[in-house]
From Swiss-Prot:
Any one of the GO BP annotations: phosphatidylethanolamine biosynthetic process
GO MF annotation, one: phosphatidylserine decarboxylase activity
Protein name: Phosphatidylserine decarboxylase proenzyme
Described purpose of this protein according to its UniProt entry: Catalyzes the formation of phosphatidylethanolamine (PtdEtn) from phosphatidylserine (PtdSer).
Gene that encodes it: psd
Location(s), subcellular: Cell membrane
Presence of keyword Lipid biosynthesis: yes
Amino acid sequence: MRRFDIGWKTYLLPEIHPEGWRFISIFAAVTFGLWLWQDWLVVPGLVLTIWCVYFFRNPKRTVPDRLGLVVTPASGIVQMVGLVDPPAELALDPPGPRQRISVFMSVFDCHVNRCPVGGTVRKIVYAPGKFVNATLDKASADNERNSVVLDIGQSRDLAFVQIAGLVARRIRCDLVEGQSVLTGEIMGLIRFGSRLDIYLPPGAAPLVAPGQSCISGETVLADLASAEPERLGVLR
């Protein structure tokens, strides 16, 4: 029997992404200043500081460890699933439409991004753009974005794209071309509220449906080693 012991630290003391400490320090300093000026203002200041800590949380994930599994690189809601043409800058091989899974992250979701599958980083492409609402389909082509193409073996590739949104104005990618990565490995962050698109290899079927909640590094989006058909969802 395999067992996971859940401790209180798992929920009350999550790790903080390094990107967050600067913002947490600023919020805390402003809160202290407000307390010196008008003591009642410490309450909204504390609320915002705690929210900042919550936003930049970086909890440990239990990553499904089996060859062929593709996990979601972002926490949030599966917004769109369908066959589309990937952005031209990806130059995927073979060219043509692919199944795209779009995950939208609200300001309340964990914004630490993870690699959806193990492989080698073949290409990283940054594209400047607009900051329209990330829930719109056109955001994948119009918005500022950072794209990563992974070689995943057997002459296959997979791409995922960090997309800025209406509020999100900062994309961070810690990967470099030629780097080997593991499934679920931390690769970056987007602040504050945004979207992440995953382009599956040809023939792969999505195993999630629009409206489904997902957890970065844990929720399985596809199984490249299985012939299971695409899953559909029903709202109940």
